[in-house]
Amino acid sequence: MSINATLFVQAIVFAILVWFTMKFVWPPIMKALDERAQKIADGLAAADKAKSELSVANKRVEEELAKSRGESAVRLAEAERRAQALIEEAKAKATEEGSKIIAAAKVEAEQQTVKARETLREQVAALAVKGAEQILRKEVNAGVHADLLGRLKTEL
C-alpha cells in the first residue's frame, strides 16, 4: 500500500471513530456532565435557600430575644415595684405597731403615775395623822375623822 491509500484508509477509520464516538460515547458523557452540572446547580440553589432561611431564622431569634429581654425587664420592674410596695407596707405596719406600743406605754405610765400619786397621798395622810397624833399626844380615830382625812387626801 502506498502512503496515499494508507492515509485515505486512516482518514476513513478516523471518520468512523469520530462517528462512533459522537453516536455512542459522547451522549452518555454529555448526559453525565449535564447531570453533574444540574446537581451542582441544585446544590448551590439549596445552599442559597438554606442561607436565606438561616438569615430569616436569625432575624426571628433576634426578635424573640428582644421580646424576651423586654418581658424580663417588665417582670423585673414589676417585681421591684412589688418589693417596694411590700417594704412600704411593712414600714407602715411597723410604724403603726410602734405607735400602738408607745400609746400603750404612755397609758401604762400614766396609770402607774396615778397609782403612785394615790399611794403617796395615802402614805402622806398616814404620816400626817401620825404627826398630828404625836403633836396632840393622843390617838386620832380614823373612823371618826374620816371626813377630815378625805379632805387632806384631796388637798395633797
Swiss-Prot record:
GO molecular function: proton-transporting ATP synthase activity, rotational mechanism; proton-transporting ATPase activity, rotational mechanism
Membrane-spanning parts: 7-27
Record-level GO cellular component terms: plasma membrane; proton-transporting ATP synthase complex
Membrane protein topology class: Single-pass membrane protein
Record CDD domains: ATP-synt_Fo_b (cd06503)
Subcellular location: Cell inner membrane
Record's keyword annotation contains rRNA processing: no
Domain of life: Bacteria
Keywords noted in UniProt: ATP synthesis, Cell inner membrane, Cell membrane, CF(0), Hydrogen ion transport, Ion transport, Membrane, Transmembrane, Transmembrane helix, Transport
Main location: membrane
Task performed by this protein: F(1)F(0) ATP synthase produces ATP from ADP in the presence of a proton or sodium gradient. F-type ATPases consist of two structural domains, F(1) containing the extramembraneous catalytic core and F(0) containing the membrane proton channel, linked together by a central stalk and a peripheral stalk. During catalysis, ATP synthesis in the catalytic domain of F(1) is coupled via a rotary mechanism of the central stalk subunits to proton translocation.
Similarity remark: Belongs to the ATPase B chain family.
HAMAP family: ATP_synth_b_bprime (MF_01398)
Subunit structure: F-type ATPases have 2 components, F(1) - the catalytic core - and F(0) - the membrane proton channel. F(1) has five subunits: alpha(3), beta(3), gamma(1), delta(1), epsilon(1). F(0) has three main subunits: a(1), b(2) and c(10-14). The alpha and beta chains form an alternating ring which encloses part of the gamma chain. F(1) is attached to F(0) by a central stalk formed by the gamma and epsilon chains, while a peripheral stalk is formed by the delta and b chains.
Name under which the protein is recorded: ATP synthase subunit b
Species assigned in the record: Polaromonas sp. (strain JS666 / ATCC BAA-500)
